[in-house]
From Swiss-Prot:
It catalyses: acetate + ATP + CoA = acetyl-CoA + AMP + diphosphate. InterPro entries: Ac_CoA_lig (IPR011904), ACAS_N (IPR032387), AMP-bd_C (IPR025110), AMP-bd_C_sf (IPR045851), AMP-binding_CS (IPR020845), AMP-dep_synth/lig_dom (IPR000873), ANL_N_sf (IPR042099). GO terms for molecular function: acetate-CoA ligase activity; AMP binding; ATP binding; metal ion binding. This is Acetyl-coenzyme A synthetase. Its EC number is 6.2.1.1. The modification N6-acetyllysine is found at K609.
C-alpha cells in the first residue's frame, strides 16, 4: 500500500474492534459472491413479526426494474427501536437532549421514550391518521421530532420530514406532492440564539391555493412565542397527550411497505420524494451504524445532523435506536455561542462517537484551535464525517484538534437515495488516507464507468455507479416511478448512477470528486441548480439565470449565479441584495446565492443549451484553459463574463 499520508489502524482499536482487515475481506467477499446467504444471516439482526424466507429480488434493468428485500417478512420499525430494548434496557438513556441554550437539558430513557411514542401514536390516530397516510413533520431539533417519526412508524403512517430551514413555498410543494392530511410542527425553534418561526412558516405554506389536503396541524409548545391559531385545524400537542393511552400495539408492516418519504433536490426543479421501505432499510441502517462506528453497548453517540436530512433519519433515529444506543440530540449549532461549544458538549455528555460534517469542521478551523485549549475529549473514540468529501486539511485538523490523534476517522460516502453508508473505512479494518472514503461496505459493488458506460478497471477516474442492489436502497420517487427509472437507471444501462464522480487509487480506495450532474453541495446539503434558477427567474426583473457551484472555503461549494436582467433594468447592488433575499424566501436560507454576476448574455449552443462547464470554470476562477468554445452561438460572451467575474484571486 502506498504510504502517502497513510493513517494505520491503531493496535488498541484493532484489538477490540468488531471487524479487523482479514474479517472485512472475508465478509465483503461473501456479501458479493453470495448476497442471499450473507443477508439471510444479517437480516436477523432486527426483530421480525413474521420471519422472512425470501431475501432478494432485484434487477437494475431499466425495462424490468425490481428492488425487493426480505420481502415476505413483516415487522415494525418503532418496535425495533423501542419495544425490543424494554426487557433488559428500559432504564438506559435513549436520548440526551441539550437545547440551544446549554442550561436546558433532558434525559429520556427507553422506557419513557416508548411511553411517549405510544401516547403520540394514539394521538395521531385520534386526529384521523391511518396506515399509509403521509404525515408532514416540520420540527426543531427536539426529542419530540423523533417521537413524531417513531409514532408514525408505529401505526404504519408514512412520515415526510421537512428541514426546519426550508421556506413556506418549499414546504407547500412537499405537502402538495404527498397530499398530507396532518402536519406536525412547533410554535418556534431555537437555533444560534434566534427563534425560528416554524408555525408561521407552516401557516404561510398552508395558505398556498394548491394545498387542499391538510385537516389538522399539531403544534408543540417549544418557546411559548406568539403564534396565529386556526380554530378547528390547529391543536396543541400537549392537549392531545392528556387523554392518550400509553399502550399502542405496533402495526404489522410488510418489509416493502413504505416507512418514510424524504424530499431531495434533483437536477430538475421539482423536489423528488425519495421513498424508503421498512425491512431492508432497518437492517441496513442498524448494521451500518454498528459496524461503521464500531458501536459498543452503552456508548454515547452524537450525530450533529438535522433530523430533516437523511443522516438524521438513519444515524440519529433509526440506526442508533435500533441498536439501543444513547443518542445526543442538540437543538442549536455546535459553534454557538462560541466555537468551544462542540468540545464542551463532548466533555459534558462524555460522547464516545461523533458524526459531523466537513462544513462545521472548516468553520471551526477558521476560528482557530485556541477554542479547544480547555477541551479534554478523552471519552471520544470514533469520529465520522458526512455530507460531502472532506478536504485533507480539514481531515487532519479534525484528527489532531478534536480527535487528539487517537480517534479513527470514518469518512462516509452515501446519499439520501441509498438509505445508509455505502463507501467508508471500518475503524478496526481500514488504514485511512485523508480525503478518501476508502472501501465499500458489505454488499456494495461500486464501479467507475466512462461517459459511454464502459467499466474502467484499476487506478482510474470516472462516473461512480453501483452494480447491484443493497437493502437500504430507495424503491421509487413517490408518485413518479418513471422519474426514478430515468434519473438513476437510464444513463448507464443495468447500473445505478449516483450522479457523483470518483477516482480509484492504486490501493483500490475511492475518492469522491463531486457531482457530475446539475446538483451542488452546499454545507453538505444538496441543491438542484434548476431549483435556484427557477426562483431567480420568477423575479419580474430577471430574464434568465444560470447557477453553478464554486469552491468555497467553509461551505465546500458556494452558489454562483449569472443573471441576465430584463431589458432596460438597471444593474445595482440593491437589486443584487433583493435577489438574494428573493431566493431565500422562495427556497430557504441554504439556497441564497453567494455571488451574483450580471450577465448581458450566457454561453449557449446554437440550439439554445446553456454550456454550464464554461460557467463553472469562470466561477472557479479557472479561466486560462476553458476548452473548445466553437459550438457556442456567440463565443464573445465568454470574454465578457471572464472580464466581469466576481471570484477573482489576483
Amino acid at each position: 500500500m502506498s504510504s502517502q499520508s497513510l493513517y494505520k489502524v491503531s493496535g488498541n482499536i484493532a484489538a477490540n474492534a468488531l471487524v479487523n482487515n482479514e474479517q472485512y475481506k472475508t465478509m465483503y467477499q461473501e456479501s458479493i459472491v453470495n448476497p442471499e446467504g450473507f443477508w439471510r444471516e444479517h437480516g436477523k439482526r432486527i426483530d421480525w413479526i413474521k420471519p422472512y424466507t425470501k431475501i432478494k429480488k432485484t434487477s437494475f434493468d431499466d425495462h424490468n426494474l425490481s428492488i425487493n428485500w426480505f420481502y415476505d417478512g413483516t415487522l415494525n420499525a418503532s418496535a425495533n427501536c423501542l419495544d425490543r430494548h424494554l426487557s433488559e434496557h428500559s432504564d438506559r438513556v435513549a436520548i440526551i437532549w441539550e437545547g440551544d441554550n446549554a442550561s436546558e437539558q433532558r434525559k429520556i430513557t427507553y422506557g419513557e421514550l416508548h411511553a411517549d411514542v405510544c401516547k403520540f401514536a394514539n394521538a395521531l390516530r385520534s386526529q384521523g391518521v391511518r396506515r399509509g397516510d403521509i404525515v408532514t413533520i416540520y420540527m426543531p431539533m427536539v426529542p419530540e421530532a423523533a417521537v413524531a417519526m417513531l409514532a408514525c412508524a408505529r401505526i404504519g403512517a408514512v412520515h415526510s420530514v421537512v428541514f426546519g430551514g426550508f421556506s413556506p413555498d418549499s414546504i407547500a410543494s412537499r405537502v402538495i406532492d404527498g397530499k398530507s392530511k396532518v402536519v406536525i410542527t412547533s410554535d418556534e425553534g431555537m437555533r444560534g440564539g434566534r427563534a425560528i418561526p416554524l408555525k408561521r412558516n407552516i401557516d404561510d405554506a398552508l395558505n398556498h391555493p394548491d394545498v387542499t389536503s391538510v385537516e389538522k396541524v399539531i403544534v408543540l409548545k417549544r418557546t411559548g412565542g406568539k403564534i396565529d391559531w386556526v380554530e378547528g385545524r390547529d391543536v396543541w400537542w400537549h392537549s392531545l397527550l392528556e387523554t392518550a393511552s400509553e399502550h399502542c400495539q405496533p402495526e404489522e408492516m410488510g418489509a416493502e411497505d413504505p416507512l418514510f418519504l424524504l424530499y431531495t433536490s434533483g437536477s430538475t426543479g421539482n423536489p423528488k420524494g425519495v421513498l424508503h421501505t421498512t425491512g431492508g432499510y432497518m437492517v441496513y441502517a442498524s448494521m451500518t451504524h454498528e459496524y461503521v462506528f464500531d458501536y459498543k453497548a452503552g456508548e454515547v453517540y452524537w450525530c450533529t445532523a438535522d433530523v430533516g436530512w437523511i443522516t438524521g433519519h438513519s444515524y440519529m433515529v433509526y440506526g442508533p435506536l435500533a441498536n439501543g444506543a444513547t443518542v445526543l440530540i442538540h437543538e442549536g449549532v455546535p459553534n454557538h455561542p462560541s466555537p468551544a461549544r462542540l468540545g464542551e458538549m463532548i466533555d459534558r455528555h462524555k460522547v464516545n462517537i461523533l458524526y459531523t460534517a466537513p462544513t462545521l469542521i472548516r468553520a471551526l478551523m477558521a476560528e482557530g484551535k485556541q477554542h479547544f485549549d480547555q477541551f479534554d475529549g478523552s471519552t471520544l473514540r470514533i469520529m465520522g464525517s458526512v455530507g460531502e468529501p472532506i478536504n485533507p486539511e480539514a481531515w487532519r485538523w479534525y484528527h489532531e484538534v478534536i480527535g487528539h490523534e487517537h480517534c479513527p476517522i470514518v469518512d462516509t460516502w452515501w446519499q439520501t437515495e441509498t438509505g445508509g453508508i455505502l463507501i467508508t473505512p471500518l475503524p478496526g479494518a481500514t488504514d485511512t488516507k485523508p480525503g478518501s472514503a476508502t472501501r465499500p461496505f458489505f454488499g456494495v459493488q461500486p464501479a467507475l464507468v466512462d461517459n459511454m458506460g464502459n467499466i474502467l478497471e484499476g487506478e482510474n477516474e470516472g462516473n461512480l455507479v453501483l452494480l447491484d442492489s443493497w437493502p437500504g436502497q430507495m424503491r421509487t420517487v413517490y408518485g413518479d416511478h418513471e422519474r426514478f427509472v430515468l434519473t438513476y437507471f437510464k444513463t448507464f444501462r443495468g447500473m445505478y448512477f449516483t450522479g457523483d464522480g470518483a477516482r480509484r487509487d492504486e490501493d483500490g480506495y475511492y475518492w469522491i470528486t463531486g457531482r457530475v450532474d446539475d446538483v451542488i453541495n452546499v454545507s453538505g446539503h444538496r441543491l438542484g441548480t434548476a431549483e435556484v434558477e427557477s426562483a431567480l427567474v420568477s423575479h419580474e426583473l430577471v430574464a434568465e439565470a444560470a447557477v453553478v457551484g464554486y469552491p468555497h472555503d467553509i461551505k465546500g461549494q458556494g452558489i454562483y449565479a449569472y443573471v441576465t436582467l430584463t431589458r432596460g433594468t438597471e444593474e445595482s447592488e440593491e437589486l443584487r441584495q433583493e435577489l438574494r433575499q428573493w431566493v431565500r424566501k422562495e427556497i430557504g436560507a441554504l439556497a441564497t446565492p453567494d455571488l451574483i454576476q450580471w450577465a448581458s448574455g450566457l454561453p449557449k449552443t446554437r440550439s439554445g443549451k446553456i454550456m454550464r462547464r464554461f460557467l463553472r470554470k469562470i466561477a472557479a476562477n479557472e479561466v486560462t484553459n476553458l476548452g473548445d468554445a466553437s459550438t457556442l452561438a456567440d463565443p464573445a460572451v465568454i470574454e465578457t463574463l471572464i472580464e466581469t467575474r466576481l471570484n477573482r484571486t489576483e
